[in-house]
Design a protein with these regions (language model features):
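Active-site loop segments of alpha/beta catalytic cores
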Residues: 1-51, 77, 111-350
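Short, surface-exposed, low-complexity cationic segments
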Residues: 38, 87-111
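Short, basic/low-complexity N-terminal boundary segments at the transition from targeting/disordered tails
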Residues: 44-64
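Short acidic, Pro/Gly- and aromatic-enriched capping/linker segments at domain boundaries
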Residues: 58-76
């Protein structure tokens, strides 16, 4: 194993740290292709060693969800004009309570929404700047956080979940039309970034529930949300780009729709979703990104075995690490690589 190189962490911590560099028998990109297609991968990719990970705003120059604020709450305005408050304790942002919404009425979206500028020259410069940074590694996979999907953006512009869910019920046609136009915007945005930063995977965010149940019914999913989401996913995948779909909430009732949308990976809340039962039911048609939620060495190393055994038998599996302790993160990363190499070696040699 090489001494290690300093990489930039994007997520709940932005502290640079050293991670192992492994002498792999095939390229990171080839192994990822195999993982995405259940085609005999050799190890489990992880966010620290296999990916160049960026926030969308780094690549577009547009104000976007971010994790670079300090220890105090900070207000900020996103690319659509929504007002957010950075919450350091949560490691993320929430719509600012009492903030003025972009829209009071979703039926006004055609006249009142100001669509963000997709200036190609600005995006080109942002992508080139990102690729010039010392933490960017050409041999790694290009992976970025695309940002909010259909229902999250609807909620954001209307000022909250109550307003967003009421709009879905009271003005379904306007909501659907807005989400279709948002999808057209998203396709243009994706294509421009992909032109200047060939993209291996995006993370798409659309939270569909609380820890108790989904925000909306199967009928709303089928009539309003599914089609624009499917159009975007199909376009991204047609360009050879994988999708990691992050969706918070107890989304058991929506799993069939997620499988039909066919992202390579789902990133879901472990405490309210039984990933093992989903895997048992859908097999190779469903995949997962499982995040390490601890800096306890023994727990991280045990999880490196457990989740692979249960969820990654044939592929469609990777791990995200938001580490703040360099030594523990290093050891956990080594354990994941070494164990997964042994796991797949045994599987393919038997």
């Amino acid at each position: 194993m090489a001494e290690g190189a300093k990489y930039h962490l994007t997520g709940t911590t932005n502290k640079p740290m050293n991670v192992p560099v492994f002498d792999t028998p095939i390229s990171i990109r080839e192994n990822f292709r195999r993982m995405c297609t259940n085609d005999k991968p050799l190890w489990v990719p992880n966010s620290m060693t296999d990916f160049n990970y960026a926030m969308g705003g780094e690549l577009t120059g547009l104000s976007d969800i971010r994790f670079t604020f300090g220890p105090d709450p900070v207000d900020w305005v996103d690319l659509f004009g929504c007002i957010w408050e950075w919450e350091p304790a949560a490691g993320g942002s929430m719509l600012k309570p009492g903030g003025k919404p972009v829209l009071e009425d979703i039926t006004d979206w055609e006249t009142d929404i100001v669509w963000p500028s997709l200036d190609e020259e600005r995006i080109r410069k942002c992508c080139e700047l990102y690729q010039s940074q010392p933490y960017y590694q050409p041999s790694k996979l290009n992976y970025y956080d695309f940002g909010q999907g259909c229902t999250e953006r609807l909620v954001a512009i209307l000022g909250g979940y109550v307003e967003g869910m009421c709009a879905l019920l009271e003005e379904p046609e306007a909501c659907r039309d807005f989400m279709m136009e948002l999808t057209r915007f998203h396709i243009k945005l994706f294509d421009l970034v992909n032109k200047y930063l060939p993209t291996d995977m995006i993370m798409y965010h659309d939270d569909w529930g609380t820890e108790r149940d989904t925000f909306f019914s199967e009928n709303v999913m089928e009539e309003l949300v599914f089609e624009p989401t499917k159009i975007f996913f199909d376009h991204v995948k047609s360009q050879g780009t994988a999708i990691c779909f992050h969706s918070c909430g107890n989304n058991k009732r929506f799993i069939p729709y997620m499988v039909e949308l066919n992202p390579e990976y789902l990133q879901m809340q472990l405490r309210c979703n039984d990933l093992v039962s989903f895997k048992e039911k859908y097999g190779d048609d469903i995949g997962f990104d499982v995040t390490y939620h601890t800096n306890v060495r023994e727990v991280m190393e045990a999880e490196s075995h457990e989740y692979l055994n249960e969820l990654g038998q044939n592929g469609r599996f990777f791990r995200t690490i938001f580490g703040s302790n360099e030594e523990v993160t290093w050891d956990a990363t080594e354990e994941l690589y070494n164990y997964s190499r042994e796991f797949y070696d045994r599987k393919y040699s038997s």
